[in-house]
Amino acid sequence: MRSLALCLLLMLAGCDLFERRPVQTLHEDVRFTVGSPYQAGGVVRYPREAYGVDETGLATIAPDYHGLTADGEIFDQTLLAAGHRTLQLPAIVQVTNLENGRQITLRLNDRGPSSPARLIALTKRSAELLDIHHDGTRVRLQMIDAETRQLAASLQASGPTLAVAAAPQGKVEAETLAPPGGAPQSSRVRQAAATPAPANGTAPVVEALPRRLPERIVQFPAAPGRLYIAAGSFSRADYASILVNRLAFLGARLTTSYTASRDSAFQIRIGPFDTVAEAEAMLTRAIQAGVNDAAIVVE
């Protein structure tokens, strides 16, 4: 009986050690993926490959998860990574905490968050570097097109090429820069253009990106902005006016953006709102009114 109890204790101890062992390598099935439409939080999402992405919204911190991310990596809270509802995976982006001006570079490698009121789900390490300690922090996401294209090309051409060895983390680097040019745009997406083939017909040489991106913090002035509901964008004012009239009971109004792409020049906004709770409540009403792609933005 004593021997059986000892064996059980050893088995439990072994399981505990296994669960706490840090992940040091990637699963072999890391892949470029866009994915099919799916439903989350009562809203259907349509993943797409896009570049020139510049979005604002609210961040959350991803819960612990023992499994694979949407692009085939082993989920790891210590990586500079995050989940996004619709963008291609993996993708390299800059994320700025608009409430304190901190900016880091991370890799989108998973789907999420499930709530339609959140733009991005950060790993715990990403949240630490951005000094984010609560759900609903205002952030800006900007895709780094060159590195995202490089990563996509490497994975599509020859399969998994992320460097599987964990790079030394070293110390966190930080610097202070002047504010970025232009006010943050709530959503500015440009569809991918075809990449011209090399003149000699050979495949381009692409270098694998490390699994652990450098922990480098860039400090900008804080620019928390105000919360709005983005309820649609159109290339023509008359098209936008139809939806504005339909959402008049919510206080929708038509605005013109001179920095967004031509097909998003006429934008519908509801707000502003003083609190996240107020914005979330209005977002729910907008979705119930049939605007499935409505989102909370910061302007």
Residue ranges and their predicted role:
Residues 204-224, 233-299:
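Extracytoplasmic
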Residues 95, 229-231, 268:
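A short beta-strand micro-motif
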